[in-house]
Design a protein with these regions (language model features):
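Extended polysaccharide-engagement surfaces of secreted carbohydrate-active enzymes
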Residues: 277, 282-668
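C-terminal segment of N-terminal export signals and the immediately downstream linker at the start
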Residues: 3, 24-59
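N-terminal export signals
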Residues: 9-28
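Short secondary-structure junctions and interdomain/linker hinges
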Residues: 67, 71, 88, 92, ...
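Hydrophobic alpha-helical membrane-insertion signals
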Residues: 50-52, 59-99
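Aromatic-lined, polymer-binding surfaces characteristic
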Residues: 75-78, 106-320
Length: 668
């Protein structure tokens, strides 16, 4: 038995070498990743983005030129919002005012290199500026000015040591300072306007020059380091449209990149970077699209991904409403679920998930989608937190009736990403699971990537976890992955190893799929998903996940559920004798229970595991290379998170392993 494995421990020399600025979710990359842009060999003809920029310039509407505010709303729009804020929406608006960051704490002082410090400054400006225009109280104006002055004081927008002035913080500050400049234009004196305008123009110029198309340049369109900075650029472009002729070029660039971002998104609504990155990055899709829709009259919303994404986040929540089905780089696995360490203050303030659910109100309003409205209301009822509560006033349509969660199917197969979610119902007492078997960015990439020479993949936040599952029951999380990793590995998920080796090109850095043929990944697929009210039966083909030199000819995993028991049947055929290993992870202790049985302890319930007689069992700590600082995310400390049971069959060319996992509820 392994005692108290959910605690996080730093192991070996890597722990002693942990950089002072180690930032798990400073949302970093390793030196081999090209998040945003990549300069390759030039090819003939104009760059595709140049063609898009000319075809869709996204110019500021003529009636908005020379007036402020204009980016997200107008003076007339503010009047209507003020009536709602002081009328039917008073309670919601007051809650947003109570949470304004700019009223609760001072902005980070320059150079503001602590993780997320500059992000918070940008968001703080936006909230305080809107609050002043609704309330007229000088305290909000004073707060906005403090935060805007802080943004101006930062010599570098972002980290001085990793992508300065062109990355996430630059996007946040262009958005915040641009929104503040636009909303407060009429109450700022000329010296203030010039100071803020000059800073906006300077940093928008730097960022736009970096992202401007050049022969051979490609973009990680599907990755958040691309579209978050560009969303900020769009806001800044419309805010200073009258002040610099370059703003038109910035807007056209931002619109062109966003058109690609939407084009490459999975049509089933799934976000391949995982739930944590959906929470962090999806608001920026909304901010960018809202800027184009309002300022340019260019509505780009109507895409399959955005019509379906409310179902992704709904199904990603475990029945307790506060944890998630955490495929990929999501939180810290057992540590976060135990609400230990520093991260829960950010991920679960006050014990409630920071989910940014209010962005669903915007999608519900845009599509007239009662189901999306209902999902947002449900998440609100769970006490979820939003980074920008103040947007609810603009995003939520109070006239749109919300569909109850009982009307949403409790199971869904996201067929592009190859992920199935199932639950017995939408109550906290439900039994639930998720099963994943698909390529990291979805099957649609196979036909799309060759047609878009300006798109390159950066899949570091996806894990080599094909065939893995997450189980929930008896009021608690039963088994699942180990969380965010600097070096993702199949050993961190409930999937299979072949001769002790995991999937794709794991072990070579943060992106386990770098250099691995996507056509081979596309062969990973769910071939059957029969989902019913009381049972489920899923079959997946996994051979494509493993490197050819491992000799796997076929590898099939069948995953079935009925009456509180999951049955996993793995069948392998290989070119030479290999050892097949199945894995089951636990947040707490795993102990032997009989000749071939094991118990995975949980906080609310436990999981009984029964293995084939021939399987050799090993129970050991779960070991993770955690994330390092930006630019070196693959050089983080080695940590223990939870425990893992590994069941291995003797080496053979053909192997069949059957494992049953049964929910054991606590006795009252």
């Amino acid at each position: 038995m392994i005692r108290n494995p959910q605690r996080r421990r730093l192991l070996g020399a890597a722990a002693l070498a942990l950089p002072a600025l180690s930032m798990r979710a400073a949302l970093a990359q390793d030196a081999r990743e090209a998040l945003g842009t990549l300069q390759g060999k030039p090819s003939g003809g104009p760059h595709p983005l140049q063609t898009l920029m000319q075809a869709h310039p996204a110019a500021l509407r003529r009636e908005l030129r020379g007036v402020h505010p204009r980016v997200f709303t107008t003076t007339a729009g503010l009047d209507a919002l003020r009536k709602r804020a002081h009328g039917a929406e008073r309670k919601t608006w007051q809650q947003a005012l109570d949470k304004l960051a700019a009223l609760r704490q001072p902005p980070a002082a320059a150079p503001a290199q602590k993780r997320r410090a500059q992000n918070e400054t940008g968001i703080g400006i936006a909230g305080a500026a809107l609050a002043y225009r609704i309330e007229g109280d000088p305290k909000y104006l004073d707060a906005a000015r403090r935060y805007m002055d802080a943004a101006v004081s930062y010599p570098v927008w972002g980290y001085t040591f990793s992508k300065p002035d062109i990355d996430l913080a630059a996007g946040h500050l262009l958005y915040g300072l641009g929104m503040g400049y636009d909303l407060l234009y009429d109450v700022l004196d000329e010296a203030e306007r010039k100071r803020y305008r000059d800073k906006l123009v300077r940093h928008a110029t730097i960022l736009a020059d970096h992202f401007m198309p050049k022969p051979g340049k490609s973009y990680s369109y599907s990755q958040n380091h691309c579209f978050i900075p560009i969303a900020g650029l769009a806001v800044a472009a419309y805010a200073v449209w009258d002040d610099t002729p370059d703003a038109a070029r910035w807007a056209a660039l931002a619109r062109a990149i966003f058109s690609r971002v939407l084009e490459v998104a999975s049509p089933d609504g799934y976000f391949y970077e995982g739930v944590e990155y959906w929470i962090f990055s999806m608001p920026w899709i909304i901010h960018g699209l809202d800027a184009f829709a309002h300022a340019a009259g260019d509505d780009m919303y109507d895409t399959p991904n955005l019509r379906n994404t409310h179902l992704y986040i709904a199904h990603s929540l475990t029945p307790n409403g506060q944890d998630v089905f955490d495929f990929g780089d999501v939180f810290e696995g057992p540590v976060t679920r135990a609400r230990k360490g520093e991260e829960p203050a950010r991920t679960h303030p006050g014990g409630k998930l920071n989910s940014n659910y209010n962005l669903l109100y915007r999608l519900a309003a845009r599509f007239g989608n009662a189901e999306a409205q209902g999902v947002a209301d449900w998440m609100a009822s769970l006490g979820h937190v939003c980074a920008e509560d103040f947007w609810t006033l603009l995003w939520r349509d109070p006239a749109l009736a919300a569909a109850p969660m009982s009307s949403v199917a409790p199971h869904r197969h996201f067929d592009d990403l190859g992920t199935v979610y199932w639950r017995s119902d939408w109550t906290p007492a439900a039994t639930a699971f998720a099963f994943r078997a698909g390529p990291p960015e979805g099957h649609h990439v196979t036909t799309r990537i060759g047609k878009l020479p300006d798109w390159h993949l950066e899949t570091g936040h996806a894990h080599p976890d094909a065939g893995s599952f997450i189980l929930y029951g008896g009021g608690g999380y039963l088994t699942g992955p180990m969380g965010y990793a600097g070096i993702p590995s199949s050993k961190l998920s409930n999937t299979l190893l072949v001769d002790g080796q995991g999937q794709a090109n794991e072990g070579g850095g943060h992106d386990a799929f770098r250099g691995y043929p996507y056509a081979r990944l596309d062969a990973i697929r769910i071939t059957r998903a029969e989902l019913g009210r009381e049972r489920a039966d899923i079959v997946a083909e996994l051979a494509g996940a493993y490197r050819p030199e491992l000799g796997v000819d076929t590898l099939q995993r069948r995953f079935s559920y009925a009456a509180g028991t999951w049955t996993v049947t793995d069948q392998l055929r290989a070119a030479r004798p290999v050892v097949l290993t199945a894995q089951v992870h636990g947040d707490q202790d795993i102990a032997a229970a009989g000749a071939h049985g094991f118990v995975v302890e949980g906080r609310a319930a436990s999981l009984r595991v029964e293995a084939a007689a021939a399987a050799r069992a090993v129970i050991e700590p779960g070991v993770v290379v955690a994330a390092g600082p930006p630019g070196h995310v693959d050089q983080g400390p080695t940590e223990e998170r939870g425990t893992v049971l590994r069941l291995s069959l003797p080496a053979a060319r053909e192997a069949r392993l059957v494992t049953t996992l049964s929910l054991q509820r606590r006795r009252a």
